[in-house]
């Protein structure tokens, strides 16, 4: 099916372009959400009449998104989750969790704006891309840790999956003298 795009859609085209898409994608997503019109003569005339208004609305949304992007870009958000000793989470952190944390910090964000290729399943610092508008994207850091204290240590660059971080001990072997003394004690017994 051919449709006229009413806004820029990633991997599809710019506003005003006529593109061919699968029927199901057009009927179930583009047309119901008002992102496109069927490409026929009546709709082409209708679009040309509304083009200036649609471009003005798009520019306004883009400017709002850029204002939010200036505040949000480079921010760091802490997510506290329970995890095993090796840093593997019991569960995962999904787009919904990230959107909820960012929204709790005063930003309006929907989970479909968070771009995450796969759920996060380990503690650490993770870069996440947020799409505020088809033309405006920002990067935020999500700090996933077992506690806020660990999150602060992680933010300073400490690796919390090492043995020292897990058990609070240094990884130095015992000297040979300790073993010699134990052997002598066993021989005397």
Swiss-Prot record:
Decide whether keyword rRNA-binding is in the record.
Answer: yes
Q: One MF term from GO for this chain?
A: rRNA binding
**Signal peptide extent:** none
Q: Which PROSITE patterns match?
A: RIBOSOMAL_L9
Biological process terms in GO annotation: translation
Any one cellular-component term (Gene Ontology):
ribosome
Q: Which UniProt keywords apply?
A: Ribonucleoprotein, Ribosomal protein, RNA-binding, rRNA-binding
Keyword Ribonucleoprotein on entry: yes
What Pfam families has UniProt attached to this entry? Ribosomal_L9_C (PF03948), Ribosomal_L9_N (PF01281)
Q: Which Gene3D superfamilies match?
A: Ribosomal protein L9, C-terminal domain (3.10.430.100), Ribosomal protein L9, N-terminal domain (3.40.5.10)
InterPro entries tied to this protein = Ribosomal_bL9, Ribosomal_bL9/RNase_H1_N, Ribosomal_bL9_bac/chp, Ribosomal_bL9_C, Ribosomal_bL9_C_sf, Ribosomal_bL9_N, Ribosomal_bL9_N_sf
This protein's source sits in the domain of life called Bacteria
Instruction: Tell me the PANTHER family matching this sequence.
Output: 50S RIBOSOMAL PROTEIN L9
Homology family: Belongs to the bacterial ribosomal protein bL9 family.
Q: What does this protein do?
A: Binds to the 23S rRNA.
Q: What is this protein called?
A: Large ribosomal subunit protein bL9
Q: Which organism is it from?
A: Brucella anthropi (strain ATCC 49188 / DSM 6882 / CCUG 24695 / JCM 21032 / LMG 3331 / NBRC 15819 / NCTC 12168 / Alc 37) (Ochrobactrum anthropi)
Taxonomic lineage from the root: Bacteria, Pseudomonadati, Pseudomonadota, Alphaproteobacteria, Hyphomicrobiales
Gene transcribed to yield this protein:
rplI
């Amino acid at each position: 099916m051919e449709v006229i795009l009413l806004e820029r859609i990633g991997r599809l085209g710019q506003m005003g372009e006529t593109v061919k898409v699968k029927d199901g994608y057009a009927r179930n997503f583009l047309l119901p959400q008002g992102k496109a019109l069927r490409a026929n003569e009546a709709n082409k005339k209708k679009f040309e009449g509304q083009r200036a208004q649609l471009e003005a609305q798009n520019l306004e949304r883009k400017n709002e998104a850029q204002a939010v992007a200036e505040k949000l870009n480079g921010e760091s958000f802490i997510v506290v989750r329970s995890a095993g000793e090796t840093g593997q989470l019991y569960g995962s952190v999904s787009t919904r969790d990230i959107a909820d944390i960012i929204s709790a910090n005063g930003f309006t964000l929907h989970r479909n704006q968070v771009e995450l290729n796969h759920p996060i399943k380990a503690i650490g610092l993770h870069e996440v891309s947020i799409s505020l508008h088809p033309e405006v994207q920002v990067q935020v850091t999500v700090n996933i840790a077992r506690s806020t204290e660990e999150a602060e240590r992680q933010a300073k660059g400490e690796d919390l999956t090492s043995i020292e971080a897990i058990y609070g001990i240094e990884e130095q072997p015992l000297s040979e003298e300790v073993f010699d003394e134990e052997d002598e004690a066993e021989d005397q017994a």
